[in-house]
């Protein structure tokens, strides 16, 4: 399957003839994409989150990422790779810094939080990584997934706290917090394109309630947050502080 509405770029793979690869001479798409990467890197961004990176030949990333890092050594490349069999390929050959841990830890923690699996299933997650756990990016929310507090997930942001502690403290790898997650954003608005599906729209101009309250008209003082927002935020602050400062967890 693929996105029907997107422009298709030729990375040098002949998908009509058995997926044969034609990488020499360097495909024109590679050169153009490298120029785009270098352009944005020059704007002092922190890094790139590469959507469905496994749908692009690993040979491209192997070629492009070192060139970007040569010019901008501190920049990060995070890949969305959902096939565990390709994890090491995109980490070690493709040169990515981190991969989303979606089909392993995220899916398991969601099932545990919703009562579909026992917490013992978490053991298989870390064992299956077998040495690359430090290269995985943990998360509980992102633009693709339903909000913890939504009716489609846990229905209450506090029910996600045990999963937060596991994600943040189990290993020394990074943990991503999606905007408004720390306030218990519901994601239950009926936005124009996607409707009420438990996600915050990425297709519409929309006002996210918890973020609007935190911004407070540009003051960014959080004074419009509810007591429930503030309480959850304090828990997130404590957990994230502990996982970064407590040596038993951070080392």
Give the label of every model feature segment:
Residues 1-39, 64, 70:
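Substrate-binding/active-site clefts of carbohydrate-active enzymes
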Residues 1-9, 42, 49, 54-85:
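Acidic/aromatic-lined carbohydrate-recognition and catalytic surfaces
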Residues 33-58, 138, 142:
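Active-site groove signature of glycoside hydrolases
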Residues 37-38, 61-65, 122-123, 164, ...:
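Generic structural signal for well-ordered alpha-helices
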Residues 47-49, 74-78, 97-99, 135-138, ...:
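Structural preference for beta-strand elements that scaffold enzyme active sites
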Residues 58-70, 81-115, 186-195:
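Substrate-binding cleft/loops of secretory-pathway carbohydrate-active enzymes
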Residues 108-134:
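Glycoside hydrolase catalytic-domain groove-lining segments
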Residues 121, 130-136, 141-142, 147-251:
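Loop/helix patches that line or flank the sugar-binding groove of alpha-linked glycan CAZymes
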């Amino acid at each position: 399957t693929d996105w029907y509405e997107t422009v298709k770029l030729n990375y040098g793979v002949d998908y009509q003839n058995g997926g044969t690869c034609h990488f020499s001479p360097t495909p024109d798409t590679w050169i153009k994409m490298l120029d785009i990467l270098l352009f944005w890197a020059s704007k002092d961004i922190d890094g790139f989150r590469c959507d469905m990176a496994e749908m692009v030949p690993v040979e491209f990333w192997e070629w492009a990422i070192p060139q970007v890092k040569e010019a901008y050594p501190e920049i990060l490349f995070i890949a969305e790779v959902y096939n565990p069999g390709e994890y090491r390929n995109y980490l070690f050959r493709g040169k990515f810094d981190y991969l989303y841990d979606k089909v392993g830890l995220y899916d398991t923690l969601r099932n545990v939080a919703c009562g579909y699996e026992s917490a013992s299933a978490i053991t298989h997650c870390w064992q299956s990584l077998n040495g690359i756990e430090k290269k995985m990016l943990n998360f509980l929310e992102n633009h693709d997934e339903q909000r913890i507090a939504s009716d489609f997930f846990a229905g209450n942001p506090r029910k996600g706290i045990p999963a937060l502690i596991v994600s943040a403290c189990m290993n020394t790898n990074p943990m991503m917090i999606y905007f408004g997650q720390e306030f218990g954003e519901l994601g239950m608005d009926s936005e124009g394109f996607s409707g009420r599906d438990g996600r915050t729209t990425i297709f519409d101009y929309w006002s996210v309630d918890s973020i609007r309250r935190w911004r407070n008209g540009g003051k960014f003082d959080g004074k419009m947050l509810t007591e429930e927002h503030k309480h959850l935020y304090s828990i997130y602050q404590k957990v994230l502080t502990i996982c970064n400062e407590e040596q038993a967890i951070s080392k």
